From Swiss-Prot:
Name assigned to this protein: Enolase-phosphatase E1
Matching InterPro entries: Enolase-ppase_E1, ENOPH1_eukaryotes, HAD-like_sf, HAD_sf
Function: Bifunctional enzyme that catalyzes the enolization of 2,3-diketo-5-methylthiopentyl-1-phosphate (DK-MTP-1-P) into the intermediate 2-hydroxy-3-keto-5-methylthiopentenyl-1-phosphate (HK-MTPenyl-1-P), which is then dephosphorylated to form the acireductone 1,2-dihydroxy-3-keto-5-methylthiopentene (DHK-MTPene).
Origin superkingdom: Eukaryota
Native organism: Meyerozyma guilliermondii (strain ATCC 6260 / CBS 566 / DSM 6381 / JCM 1539 / NBRC 10279 / NRRL Y-324) (Yeast)
Family statement drawn from the similarity comment of this UniProt entry: Belongs to the HAD-like hydrolase superfamily. MasA/MtnC family.
Subunit structure: Monomer.
Subcellular location: Cytoplasm; Nucleus
Length: 233
């Protein structure tokens, strides 16, 4: 088993974030609440109709027109997206902008697992990130890691639902393979806490394994047959 793990990590690696390299609670209990707390202070400065010259207004102008009438409509709509965990690219862009403020002023620090830090900083093979969060938000997270670490110099690239598609669709993984130079799919391994994402990557020809961390969702016996790890060796 250890030999098999070493062989997997001697390959190009693509990592999910939430529940894979950092606790799922960081996103649900820290990032999402912080975003919601900052909504009113940020949106209260907007002028309606929205002035696209303003970065926040420019993002909000991409939401459906019927929610752009006033601050209350915008906040209600955005809160609904967050509550339903909708993978909306416009929402992800706005979250990234808000989280940047939090990371920059020290309110937010990413609790990346120690074993994930070790993998990212010592791997001789390329490591990429694929998350539903925007590429901008991914870069913020990995550049503001506990211990005052910046892991971005060790990462080869980033992908999100805007660049590559949704994570439960096998064509998204084929798109990533094309973007990283069309390596043989079986030489690339994807790690995620989501069985559906792992299945999609396998369908695209990649190797893929489920990462089991504290707080992650339960797995069925069928899920476990896909292969699991509890940490990166």
């Amino acid at each position: 088993m250890k030999t098999e793990c070493r062989e997997l990590f001697a390959m190009t690696v693509i990592l999910d974030i939430e529940g894979t390299v950092c606790p799922i609670t960081f996103v649900k209990d820290t990032l999402f609440p912080y975003f919601l707390e900052q909504l009113h202070p940020i949106l209260s400065s907007l002028q309606f109709p929205l002035d696209k010259a303003d970065p926040v207004a420019n993002i909000c102008s991409q939401f459906p027109s019927h929610v752009q009438q006033d601050e209350t409509s915008l906040i209600t709509y955005i809160r609904q997206l967050v509550a339903s965990d909708t993978k909306d690219p416009v929402l992800k862009s706005l979250q990234g902008l808000v989280w940047k403020k939090g990371y920059d002023n020290g309110d937010l620090v990413a609790p990346i697992y120690d074993d994930a830090i070790a993998l990212i900083t010592t791997s001789s093979e390329p490591i990429y990130i694929y998350s539903s969060g925007s590429v901008a938000a991914q870069k913020l997270l990995f550049s503001h890691v506990k211990g005052n670490l910046d892991l971005t110099p060790h990462l080869a690239g980033y992908f999100d639902i805007t660049t590559s598609g949704h994570k439960q669709d096998s064509t998204s993984y084929k798109s990533i393979l094309h973007a990283i130079g069309n390596p043989e799919p079986a030489t690339v391994t994807f790690y995620s806490d989501s069985p559906a994402e792992v299945r999609a990557a396998i369908e695209a020809g990649m190797k893929a394994t489920i990462v089991v961390r504290p707080g992650n969702g339960p797995l069925t016996d069928q899920d476990r047959q896909l292969g699991t790890i509890t940490s990166f060796p």
